Amino acid sequence: MKLKIAILGTRGIPNYYGGFEHISEYVSAGLVKKGHSVTVYNSHNHPYEADTWNGVNIVHCYDPEYLIGTAGQFAYDFNCLMDARKRKFDVVLLMGYTSSSVWGHLYPSNSVIITNMDGLEWKRSKYSKPVQQFLKYAEKLAVKHSQYYISDSRVIRSYLKDKYEVDSRYIPYGADLFSDQEREQFDKSEVLKEDYFLLMARMEPENNIETILEGFNNSSSKKSFMVLGDTSNRFGKFITHRFKNDDRIQFKGANFDNSVVRALQNNSYLYFHGHSVGGTNPSLLEAMASEALIAAHNNPFNKSVLNSDAFYFDNANEVRHLVENVQRKDTEREMVKNNLHKIQYQFNWEVVINDYEDFILECYQQQHGKVIKA
């Protein structure tokens, strides 16, 4: 028996935005290949306007975020839920809860509700105290109104168990291995191999960009430091202004060409990953898959993925030490190799898609008492 599955909570596919869109793109297409009927809800503002994508049905719902800001996300999620209630899906998979769980009483009663519980959004320092309090409340509502839960990090799974006494299925993101084709696409005349440090992140305080660049700024390194990320927001403008006098630091803006990003990661001397909040971060997995040597912020989320196969830092002083002292020798090459092995066997998209299907079928069977053959 194959199921009728809906995926809500993202801006839509194909991915032009971020983590949940990224995984929804892979999982939806993968489930279709396994014979399921899958519908993904897209914002009406999404650049992709067709009604199907790689066999996935696309429903375009009105999204007023462009008119009224963040409040529009709540209206968009409401519109998606109202449509989903009419379509009698077997399973509704909600990616996140920040603007949907307030509508939990409207979740389709005839569908099995599974929520991917996101990464402790209320901890993000970019949010004001009232917003952080609301996000805690939204998390509580998501637990209350969902029947089953997915955690993309073992840290999140432990948190949900300790905080709410609920079990969740650990299913991480995936990544594709760095291909020979991608290597060939990289123009080596643009950047000298291993002659630069690299950071790629949204310009937000919790991504420790200031700490990383301060450490580099205080170093004696003769290498350059490339920063990939949109600097047009308030924090981005602050960062570019603060380090404008260091000619070694190059702000390259946002780059959504995956092959270019992966080539830059692969060729970097050391890739800095400063994310401190959230589950399994897709950009970290991409760096691992791209065979980058990684220095990561010292926190449970990053350590649960990288273990001992990375350098860690807590402050600018430790960043400076890494910049001035890390060598590319046998031990470092072994770290890169071990991370690549993790991508092949733990964070492989085929494994992730299979885990999603297994869990969805298991949840449906538990709810309906039916034996289902995948």
Predicted regions: what they are:
Residues 46, 200, 223-237, 250-254:
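Glycosyltransferase donor-sugar binding loop
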